[in-house]
Amino acid sequence: TDVSLVFEGGVTYNSGSVTIPGGIENLVFVGVASDAGELPVLEIPTISLKEVMNGITFENVHLDGLNDGKNYLFGIGNSSCFRSISFTGCTIAHYNRSILRFNTDKLEIDEILFDDCMITDIAHDGYGMIVFGKAQTRVGLVSVTKSTLTEMGSLMQLNDGIEKVVMDQCIVYNNTFATKNYYRIDKQPGAISVTNTIFAGSNNGQKFNATYSNYSTYFLFTSSYMTSDIIIDRYGFTDITPYSGTSEDLFVDPANGDFHLKSTAKFPGKETAGDPRWW
């Protein structure tokens, strides 16, 4: 059975934690924006599955975890998982640990997609936005594209069985929150690339590692940029292009969420790097 749930823009739906019952093969959460362009707000601390599903889709909704304890939007702890999941045109906020955490092994997942999203305040209590805590049978693709990520803990923890990881045309900015590292790779994926992405922000004045350990032989940040207010501890962004100015020199008002480029920025990645919503 395929099910679509349609939500009205400008309305807040406080459903509490959700359990998807058995018998649903594909489930879509879709928002219809209000006349003012507002998305529906879905206040969902966590979602669990009763059995294996084919696909889960979120489109044009605001997902708010309410920082409800040590929460994950999806904390997959057994074989009841999806074959694919996608977030398109969404805003996602306030999940203390992860959006997606896989704490069981031998899963088969075709793809995990985030596209055209605004994501903030994730993984402040450890873990990361996407976490594979154990080896998997196969994960075809993990993709994060055309998105703005702010005040983030770790972005990804990767493990055995992942074929391809792509991050392209994103902005990653930490100002008030201090992460320790963005990427942890416990087992090298088949392919991994972070391209046309801008890393920015003072990280609350704290130095940090781009990666948990040294992956420089295979993990490159070609055609990506890093602002001068970032202070690297030990492991940096291999092959990244430094930008001579700070986040405030590059963006109009990053501390308040405006990542349009300043006309005075003289940024070589203009209209190629970063989230296209700000071009």
Describe the predicted segments one by one.
Residues V18-D258, A265-W279:
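Extracellular beta-rich repeat passengers
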Residues T1-N14, N26-D35:
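Glycine-rich repeat segments that build the extracellular carbohydrate-interaction surface of secreted
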